[in-house]
């Protein structure tokens, strides 16, 4: 997973308690995860807590985040799992901010 940068937007993928995946964007990942796990997040995750972050990809702006979210949600479950395994940032090279991604995947 990439490191967060102040004021950046993040595409995130959660694995819910029932094993399903949920994808969203946020500009505050920690707060958004707490909201999901408190049962006050998206309607989809409310009955599927707890959720854990399985992938993130930081974007340069909200527009890039929304476009990436839309593209990721169109993938099949298997394609999503493969992308998570390989690193979802590889799906969106046009949006990667080189200041945030130095090529290391620590």
Which residue ranges define each predicted feature?
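Coupling/hinge elements of helicase-like and P-loop NTPase modules
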Residues: 78-82
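GIY-YIG nuclease catalytic motif and its immediate N-terminal context
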Residues: 1-40, 46-49, 55-56, 64-73, ...
């Amino acid at each position: 997973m990439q490191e967060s940068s102040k004021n950046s937007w993040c595409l995130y993928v959660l694995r819910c308690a029932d094993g399903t995946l949920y994808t969203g964007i946020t500009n505050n990942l920690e707060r958004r995860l707490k909201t999901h796990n408190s049962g006050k997040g998206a309607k989809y995750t409310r009955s599927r807590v707890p959720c854990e972050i399985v992938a993130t990809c930081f974007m340069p702006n909200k527009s890039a985040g929304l476009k990436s979210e839309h593209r990721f949600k169109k993938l099949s479950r298997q394609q999503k799992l493969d992308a998570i395994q390989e690193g979802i940032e590889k799906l969106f090279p046009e949006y990667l901010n080189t200041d945030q991604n130095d090529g290391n995947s620590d």
